[in-house]
Amino acid sequence: MADGLILRAIRGKAKTLNLNGKRLQRVPVAVGCLISLTELQLKNNLLCRLPVELSALCRLRVLHLGNNHFEKVPEEIKYLKCLERLHLFGNRISEIPAAALDGLDNLLFLNLNNNLLEHLPREIYKLQSLETLSINNNHMKAIPKELCFLQNLQELHLANNQLDSLPDELSYLTNLKELRLSRNQLTGLPEGICKLIKLKILDVAGNFIRSFPSAMHRVPLTELYCEENPLLEKQPVFARQQEEILTLKEITARLILNHLRSRNSFFIEQIQQHPEARSVLSSRNICALCGTWFLDMWLECVTFVDVKKKMKTSSNLQLLPVRVLLCSYRCFNQKQAGIFGVAVQ
């Protein structure tokens, strides 16, 4: 039956070919003769590899390989220079060979849902035209920072994986509009997410998040889903304070940072000559109240932002707990309205 369809397609110089659900164990090599083909559908078969003859499909823009038996992304796709949409959902893929990503300069959409992936190759950055990447329902434990170099990415779907953190480089995805991270193991979000000025939809439901980054309320979200997280609640209680004792490292760091902040030429010159010290100090934080720069020791507080009127939220969420860092109890004791210490149970 498949051979008959292919023969008719060759005679008619077809631009599309539907071989879905034919129980194919291999792709007939005659498909390579369909040089006018722009869309090839091979869903719901028994395929585990592609023939090299497919490389002749120089005009192919859409390739459907969902619900087959592929264990890795087939390297043959690198020859499909015009490919824009690639569907590989519902396979057994646990590997993406770096070579498979060569030549896919025009790929806009990649669907890898429902596979067995634990990681992505660093070469993912080669997909510079990619706008939508979906890797829901895999076993992803981390995402490489190189993924954040995809400047045209608009949608990133990573729901139902095993992610416990996100790279700081997430802030590089300046065109991102939709980020789906539900049902992972995230305990927080990087501060860099607040730089995603086009982000409209954020889904972090079903994680372990207690509070959001300090500038989260400034992200232009229209939809926020965060149900089934242990979010901090506004329940003030009396607590005794124990004045902090700074380590020698912290005292020294604050002294140096203070001089650097005041543009002291001696300290600026010295820090330029000591790259290790410069690297350590680059991870500084800033007190939300007094503006003091500090390194490793701080008081983690929270403020609550009313987001109900600003965006669509899940579970009737009205007050969003937003992380605030203070340099000392001295600042905390200024009794700034709306800033609360985080209770440790």
Curated annotation (Swiss-Prot):
Belongs to the LRRC69 family. InterPro entries: Leu-rich_rpt, Leu-rich_rpt_typical-subtyp, LRR-SigEffector_domain, LRR_dom_sf, LRR_R13L4/SHOC2-like. Keywords: Leucine-rich repeat, Repeat. The lineage of its organism: Eukaryota, Metazoa, Chordata, Craniata, Vertebrata. It comes from the Eukaryota. PROSITE patterns: LRR (PS51450). LRR repeats lie at residues 13-34, 36-58, 59-80, 82-103, 106-127, 129-151, 152-173, 175-196, 198-219, 220-241. Gene3D superfamilies: Ribonuclease Inhibitor (3.80.10.10). The keyword Repeat applies. This is Leucine-rich repeat-containing protein 69. It comes from Xenopus laevis (African clawed frog). Transmembrane segments: none annotated.
